[in-house]
Every structure is written in structure tokens, then in C-alpha cells.
Curated annotation (Swiss-Prot):
Cofactor: Fe(2+); L-ascorbate
Binding site for 2-oxoglutarate: R171
EC numbers: 1.14.11.-
Enzyme class: oxidoreductase
Entry keyword annotation includes Lipid metabolism: no
Cofactor, free-text remark: Binds 1 Fe(2+) ion per subunit.
Lineage, top ranks: Bacteria, Pseudomonadati, Pseudomonadota, Alphaproteobacteria, Hyphomicrobiales
Protein name as it appears in the record: PKHD-type hydroxylase RPE_4577
Domain of life: Bacteria
Species this chain originates from: Rhodopseudomonas palustris (strain BisA53)
UniProt KW keywords: Dioxygenase, Iron, Metal-binding, Oxidoreductase, Vitamin C
A Pfam family it matches: PKHD_C
InterPro entries: Oxoglu/Fe-dep_dioxygenase_dom, PKHD_C, PKHD_hydroxylase, Pro_4_hyd_alph, Pro_4_hyd_alph_FE2OG_OXY
Length: 228
């Protein structure tokens, strides 16, 4: 299940992020890759723990907690502190097919996060670069995402995915993982579909008695399936 989440960041917030990144020093992105991923990863990354990275991470984390569509799609229990990467054309940068590590440890804390949901928040507009599509594979085929700056795509952490080679410009993004209250991807997708159906029904028929009964069903399923 891929979900496009629009306007996670405003244009002003994106501009602020880009200004911070312009002052920062970038390093080889393989510093956060697992053994398998490091063999196919060619990009740059902001080092964790720098003042710029901390401010950017806090900005993105705050925006996520205020976005109802992300909360519905991911049902977050723990969000790994957002990271930031860049793919440049002059380095022929790309990220070959891989699956994200199942468990991530938050640096300096010992807190472990199960990567149920993967997210990419675009910080470059599509016309700023060629290539650089995020391609996610599932049982229904391949799905490519190349979204406006400030928009985000979320998808199951179990998915095989890759980033195509950037041939012009630079692709800048934030990426992170979420441990969901519901680990099972099928149950999580069902809850998202149910929540969206309730929202649409309430918008069209706010006094319909099914709004209340379906809302009760949603919370009872969450009570049964959630890990807290």
C-alpha cells in the first residue's frame, strides 16, 4: 500500500530546509546502510547529530505529528528521527534494489524501532532533476513516485524498492521509518481504508447513524490489534 501524503511541509518550510542544507556538510550515504544495502547505495547524507540535521529532523517530526493522513496511514507508535539524503547527477547517484533493515537503533539512545512503514519526503521539485524516481515493488507490480517538494509517500517497510539514477540536477529528500501500532501490513491497510471510508461518509452524510457505528468498529479493531 503506497499512500501519497500531500503538503507535509509548506513551501516556506521547504525553503527553510533547503537553506539549512546548503550550509551543511554532506557525507557518504553508506554510513547508515546495512551490509546488503551498502553494496548498491550511492548517495550523500547529512550526518546525524549535527546542528543542521537535528533542526531539520525536529521540523519534519513536528509536521508529521500534525498531519492526519500520515497518522491514519502509519498509525505511528515510534518514529525514527528523520534523516536526509541527496542524489547528484555528477556522481551518477542511485540506490539499487533493496529491502530496509527490519530493526533500527536510534543513535545514542539504545531505543530500537521496527521499520513497519518506510517514508520519503521530497524536498526537491520534480522539475529540478531528471531521474531519481522512487520505485516500490509489490504483488501488483512496480510503482514510481516523484512528488512535489513538501509531499511524501509512505509504503510498507517490507517492500523491495530502489531509486533510479539522477541524470540532471539534485534530488533532496528526508527519509525515515515508523514502528506502527499495528505491525501487520494487511490489517494496517484495512484500518486505513476503514478510516478513509468513515471520513468520506461523515463528509457526505454527517448525521448518518453508520458514522457512529463504523467509528466504534474502527476503535474496537484498533483496541484488538494495537501493540502499545
Amino acid at each position: 500500500m503506497l499512500v501519497h501524503i500531500p503538503e507535509v511541509l509548506s513551501r516556506d518550510q521547504v525553503r527553510h530546509c533547503r537553506e539549512l542544507m546548503a550550509r551543511a556538510d554532506w557525507v557518504d550515504g553508506r554510513i547508515t546502510a546495512g551490509h546488503q544495502s551498502a553494496q548498491v547505495k550511492r548517495n550523500l547524507q547529512l550526518p546525524e547529530g549535527t546542528p543542521e540535521a537535528r533542526e531539520l529532523s525536529e521540523l519534519v517530526h513536528g509536521a508529521l505529528s500534525r498531519h492526519p493522513l500520515f497518522m491514519s496511514a502509519a498509525l505511528p507508535k515510534t518514529i525514527f528521527p528523520p534523516l536526509f539524503n541527496r542524489y547528484d547527477a555528477d556522481g551518477e547517484m542511485n540506490f539499487g534494489s533493496h529491502v530496509d533493515n527490519a530493526i533500527r537503533t536510534v543513535p545514542g539512545t539504545g531505543v530500537r524501532v521496527r521499520t513497519d512503514v518506510s517514508s520519503t519526503l521530497f524536498l526537491s521539485d520534480p522539475d529540478e532533476y531528471d531521474g531519481g524516481e522512487l520505485v516500490v515493488e509489490d504483488t501488483y507490480g512496480s510503482h514510481a513516485a516523484k512528488l512535489p517538494a513538501g509531499d511524501m509517500v509512505v509504503y510498507p517497510g517490507t517492500s523491495l524498492h530502489h531509486v533510479t539514477k539522477v541524470t540532471r540536477g539534485s534530488r533532496i529528500a528526508s527519509f525515515f521509518w515508523t514502528q506502527s501500532l499495528i505491525a501487520d501490513v494487511t490489517r494496517r491497510a484495512m484500518m486505513f481504508d476503514l478510516d478513509m471510508s468513515i471520513i468520506r461518509l461523515n463528509a457526505d452524510h454527517p448525521d448518518h447513524p453508520s458514522v457512529l457505528s463504523l467509528t466504534g468498529l474502527y476503535h474496537n479493531l484498533l483496541r484488538q490489534w494495537a501493540e502499545v
